[in-house]
UniProtKB/Swiss-Prot annotation:
Enzyme class label: oxidoreductase
Active-site annotation: C56
Protein name: Peptide methionine sulfoxide reductase MsrA
GO MF term list: L-methionine-(S)-S-oxide reductase activity; peptide-methionine (S)-S-oxide reductase activity
Organism: Corynebacterium glutamicum (strain ATCC 13032 / DSM 20300 / JCM 1318 / BCRC 11384 / CCUG 27702 / LMG 3730 / NBRC 12168 / NCIMB 10025 / NRRL B-2784 / 534)
Statement: the UniProt record of this protein carries the keyword Magnesium: no
């Protein structure tokens, strides 16, 4: 019997990436179906945001909109090269993007560290370009912020969790941490937005390591 294994995903380069579209795939998004808040703002004074990738974005968005202090979520693509990509293009692995949830939150009610920790606990950040059976560069673990100060705060939580995972026999964390502009985040198509509210029995995989992060609530 012959065994066949798919090649490991490889990150596309800027020169190899698809050119993308001239216009966003979702230009006038409807309000959030659960929270009722605008998907693209305007935001309230003091609200902050972070972009989080933990694998398939459907379940991740639901997890965050259920958290106290989170006042807006949407799903989209970031971290790559192709402007205004479609879902199909992202799934081809030729855009460099990962599936992302934008989380808008009130820092007086929930901290950046709590948001990061919840994400780390909800997936396996040591899996590289995959989460469970979802394989591809678009499923990589990632946290993107608007400034270096927030990125440093994210890194501190991720690094500490990495040490905890090592003590439990896991490998190195592969989570990508970076600073992006809001214009580097591209909304996904309408049917992806609040997908599990529209489709309660939809696909919602869980790939948690079961190891707590240890950030105080």
């Amino acid at each position: 019997m012959a065994w066949f294994f798919a090649p490991e995903p490889v990150m596309v380069t800027a020169d190899e990436a698809l050119k993308g579209g001239r216009h966003p795939v979702l230009e006038n998004p409807a309000p959030h179906t659960v929270l009722g808040t605008p998907v693209t703002g305007p935001w309230k004074e003091g609200q902050q945001r972070i972009w989080i990738g933990l694998g398939c974005f459907w379940g991740v968005e639901q997890m965050y909109w259920q958290m106290d202090g989170v006042e807006g979520t949407s799903v989209g693509y970031a971290g790559g090269f192709t402007p205004n990509p479609t879902y199909r293009e992202v799934c081809s692995g030729r855009t460099g993007h990962t599936e992302i949830v934008e989380v808008v939150y009130d820092p007086s009610k929930i901290s950046l560290e709590q948001l990061v920790a919840r994400g780390l606990e909800a997936h396996d950040p040591t899996q590289g370009f995959r989460q469970g059976n979802d394989v591809g560069t678009q499923y990589r673990s990632a946290y993107y912020t608007e400034n270096e100060e927030d990125a440093a705060r994210v890194k501190a939580v991720v690094d500490a969790y990495g040490e905890t995972l090592k003590q439990h026999g896991f490998g190195e964390i592969t989570t990508e941490i970076g600073v992006i502009s809001p214009s580097d985040y591209f909304l996904a198509e309408d049917y992806h937005q609040q997908y599990l509210d529209k489709n309660p029995d939809g696909y919602c995989p869980h790939h948690s390591t079961g190891i707590p992060c240890g950030v105080e609530a």
